[in-house]
Amino acid sequence: MNSLYRKAHYQGSAYTLSQLPPDEGMEVAFAGRSNVGKSSAINAITGIGGLARTSKTPGRTQMINFFQLDARRYLVDLPGYGYAKVPEAVKRQWQQTLSAYLEQRRALCGIVLVVDIRRLYQPFDLQMLEWCRSRGLPVRILLTKSDKLKRGAANQALQKATTHLQEVFPMARVQLFSAVNHTGIEAIQAQLDEWLGIGG
C-alpha cells in the first residue's frame, strides 16, 4: 500500500453543491446503493478502520463526505441510495445533487461503483454508469462482499458482471472485492494510483 492512503483524514461534508470544497485538485468518488459497503471499502483501502463511518442502517450516509490524502488528492464518499427511510423530496434532492456533482465537478477523475456481488446491477447502478458514460468518466466496479460466496460462485458472478458490462459500458472494469478478507485491495489501490497520479 502506498503510504499516502494511510494519511487519509476526514476533511468535511456537503449536503448541497454550494457546500463543496473548491473544485480543484483530483478526486475519486465512491458510489453505490445503500448498504453495499462503500464506507467499509474506503476504510479497507486506506487501512484506517473507522475513517468512513459504517452503519447497519441503510441510507445513513446522507452527505458527500471528503477524505483528504494530501493537498491535492481526495477520496469522496457519495450518499447511498435505495433504502433510505426519508421523504421522497429529500431523495429527489440527493439525486439532483449527485447528478450535478457528476456532471460539473472538474476535479472528479474517476468513479468507484460499489455493487453487492449478490445483487448485480440494480437500476441505480445502471443510472450511475450512464452518468459516467455521458461525462466520459472512467469507472471501476467493485463486486463487494465477495467473501459471502464460495470462490466458484464469486468467479461466476464476476464473469456475469463483466459480460453484461461489455454491453452497456465497455470502458469500465470489474473486480472482486472484500473488506473482510482483503480480496482485491491491491488492485483497486493500483487503479486509484493511476487516476490520482500517485507514484510508487
From Swiss-Prot:
The keyword Ribonucleoprotein does not apply. Mg(2+) binds at residues 39, 61. Signal peptide: none annotated. It comes from the Bacteria. Keywords: Cell cycle, Cell division, GTP-binding, Magnesium, Metal-binding, Nucleotide-binding, Septation. GTP binds at residues 32-39, 59-63, 77-80, 144-147, 177-179. SUPFAM superfamilies: P-loop containing nucleoside triphosphate hydrolases. Pfam families: MMR_HSR1. Transmembrane segments: none annotated. GO terms for molecular function: GTP binding; metal ion binding. Coiled coil: none annotated. GO terms for biological process: division septum assembly. Its cofactor is Mg(2+). Residues 24-198 form the EngB-type G domain. One of its GO terms (cellular component) is cytosol. InterPro entries: G_ENGB_dom, GTP-bd, GTP-bd_ribosome_bio_YsxC, P-loop_NTPase. PANTHER family: ENGB-TYPE G DOMAIN-CONTAINING PROTEIN, MSS1/TRME-RELATED GTP-BINDING PROTEIN. Belongs to the TRAFAC class TrmE-Era-EngA-EngB-Septin-like GTPase superfamily. EngB GTPase family. Necessary for normal cell division and for the maintenance of normal septation. This is Probable GTP-binding protein EngB. It comes from Nitrosococcus oceani (strain ATCC 19707 / BCRC 17464 / JCM 30415 / NCIMB 11848 / C-107). The lineage of its organism: Bacteria, Pseudomonadati, Pseudomonadota, Gammaproteobacteria, Chromatiales.
